[in-house]
């Protein structure tokens, strides 16, 4: 077969791609750091996180009370608050600083603060305020304290409304406080818990973040092992852009295809989360999501000079990315700039799409905007990766040529010296 023929070039390209795939796959399982981020973290971290929030709710959350009012109204509020199943008035403090110290020592998870003019404002018919301070290190305790405070405040407000309305019958009081009777029935998050609301989004985000960490760490290792400190080694197998990109991408796609099915199908079943996922839908959805994450990670890997750099680039972005998806923070309250910025990351559309699939039983047709966005990201990041790797390949070849020229000049100089 002639080397100039198209068939030979195709076969040679496939052979080189398989060689790159084999080399990259071997590095994934030999490099402890990459192995941890690509295999162990996706396997173990979702189990730990799901186990923490598997109870969905917590009871008797310790709370510090700072009552500067010392009035009947503040004592009524505290009594109703302490009678709730979710929260508990554990400590009574003389100042806010004393209560803050209890929070710092983790003796309590929140503070109720009643100002000195609390009862005075109520008696004047003015709006009074109760300060609620919550420790957000655990969302379950935050939810228990905040929602209990809201419920007690609403109950007391209803009593104030009845007093000011001046009704004559119980029916008048009912109409004053609840003019329209309704029953609240949760449709999708049937338990009303934190786990069913947030954890599906976290599972999808874990796929992206661990992949970026693994690809970045592998890129840092490649630079450290390369004599010229370049991402792509100078070798006959690394002679084309597409064979390099496809060879590397195939490794992470194969690994995370398994991890994706584990996170989206196995973990929710293990902890009895609401899951309406079907095999056909999730397979079709994970294909563009994993591909977009792979090419996004390969594109960013060119920025990694050392193994440790990827930690600085990726880890701190996890919480902001979760907020910008509109899951834990209303999308309507996110500024337009940050909404546009969130479209850069595959996790934004991946989380939104998966939540609809998991909680609402949506099909691919129902999440068509997110599905299209992921395919667009796949195409854009693939082209960007090819351009970036093309530049990296040129740089590697240029440095290799310069090194070879310098070596030849040194040999010639040594020969001249020896001849003299």
Model-predicted regions and their roles:
Residues 73-77, 148, 215, 295, ...:
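Hydrophobic alpha-helical segments typical of transmembrane helices
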Residues 14, 18-22, 196, 237-250, ...:
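Alpha-helical membrane-protein architecture signal
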Residues 53, 57, 220-228, 309, ...:
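Perimembrane helix-loop junctions in membrane proteins
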Residues 37-38, 200, 246-247, 310-313, ...:
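Hydrophobic core positions of alpha-helical segments in small-molecule transporters
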Residues 28-35, 206, 247-253, 257, ...:
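Loop-to-transmembrane-helix entry motif
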Residues 1-196, 391, 397-420:
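Extracytoplasmic/periplasmic domains immediately adjacent to an N-terminal transmembrane anchor
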Residues 44-47, 185-268:
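Hydrophobic alpha-helical transmembrane segments of multi-pass membrane transport proteins
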Residues 48-49, 91, 101, 254, ...:
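Membrane-spanning alpha-helical segments of multipass transporters and channels
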């Amino acid at each position: 077969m002639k080397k100039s023929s198209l068939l030979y070039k195709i076969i040679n390209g496939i052979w080189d791609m398989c060689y790159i795939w084999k080399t990259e796959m071997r590095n994934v399982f030999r490099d402890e750091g990459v192995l941890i981020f690509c295999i162990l973290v996706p396997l173990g971290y979702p189990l730990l996180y799901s186990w923490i929030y598997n109870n969905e709710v917590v009871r008797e959350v310790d709370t510090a009370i700072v009552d500067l009012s010392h009035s009947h109204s503040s004592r009524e509020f505290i009594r109703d608050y302490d009678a709730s199943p979710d929260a508990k008035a554990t400590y009574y403090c003389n100042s806010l600083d004393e209560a803050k110290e209890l929070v710092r020592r983790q003796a309590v998870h929140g503070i109720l603060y009643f100002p000195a003019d609390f009862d005075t404002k109520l008696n004047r018919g003015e709006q009074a305020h109760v300060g609620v301070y919550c420790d957000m290190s655990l969302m379950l305790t935050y939810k228990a304290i905040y929602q209990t405070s809201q419920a007690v405040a609403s109950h007391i407000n209803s009593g104030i409304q009845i007093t000011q309305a001046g009704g004559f019958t119980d029916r008048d009081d009912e109409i004053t406080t609840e003019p329209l009777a309704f029953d609240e029935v949760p449709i999708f998050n049937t338990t009303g818990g934190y786990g069913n609301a947030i954890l599906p989004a976290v599972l999808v985000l874990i796929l992206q973040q661990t992949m970026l960490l693994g690809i970045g760490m592998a890129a840092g290792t490649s630079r450290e092992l390369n004599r010229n400190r370049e991402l792509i080694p100078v070798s006959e197998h690394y002679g084309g852009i597409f064979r390099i990109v496809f060879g590397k991408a195939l490794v992470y796609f194969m690994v995370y295809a398994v991890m994706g099915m584990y996170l989206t199908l196995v973990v929710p079943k293990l902890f009895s989360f609401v899951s309406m996922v079907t095999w056909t839908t999730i397979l079709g959805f994970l294909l563009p999501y994993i591909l977009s994450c792979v090419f996004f990670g390969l594109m960013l890997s060119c920025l990694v000079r050392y193994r440790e750099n990827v930690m600085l680039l990726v880890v701190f972005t996890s919480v902001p990315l979760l907020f910008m998806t509109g899951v834990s923070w209303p999308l309507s309250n996110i500024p337009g700039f940050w909404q546009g910025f969130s479209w850069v990351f595959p996790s934004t559309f991946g989380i939104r799409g998966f939540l609809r699939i998991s909680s609402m039983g949506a099909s691919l047709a129902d999440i068509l905007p997110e599905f299209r966005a992921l395919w667009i990201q796949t195409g854009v990041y693939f082209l960007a990766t090819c351009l970036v790797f093309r530049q990296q390949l040129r740089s590697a070849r240029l440095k290799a040529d310069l090194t070879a020229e310098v070596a030849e000049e040194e040999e010639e100089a040594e020969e001249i010296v020896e001849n003299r």
